[in-house]
Amino acid sequence: MKNILLIIFLIPLLINCQTEKAVSKYPSHVGNVEFDEKLDDPNFKRCGENKYAYQYYHASESGIPFKGEKLDIIRKLEKENIASTKSVNGYITVRFVINCEGKTGIFRMQEMDENYIEEELDKKLSDQLFTFTKNLKGWIPTEIEGKKIDYYQHLTYKIENGKVSEILP
């Protein structure tokens, strides 16, 4: 009788044991962007043992961590004279990782209209702003507790009547 009771108690335990490892479809951290060999530069290297990067708000207490700050980015953009022939309004955000050496990679772009609804504004304009952002040199590496880190940064271009009217943040 003891053996029968033991078997009755052990069967549910054995049935509920997992033999497979559950794999999450979600990134290890909210907002984490995984490397995509189809989109990303294979020469871009992340630093440290972590596969994730800190969010942009960890990087700088005083604005954009760029040599010459946001004003220098604005000046560079004005020299490029990037504009659309269409009268479009909205936002183009380019998000990327800055590694511990100040190099950039893993770029992603999102476009939305002035009501924050995802929409392609103007392919030529968005391609120009994407390339402009990728070519920016002068990102400042940052540290947390004396350790150099990788971090996300983003630039959002506010578009009014086909022209960049503001760079956020």
Language model region names:
Residues 4-14:
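Sec-dependent N-terminal signal peptides
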Residues 18-169:
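Charge-biased low-complexity segments
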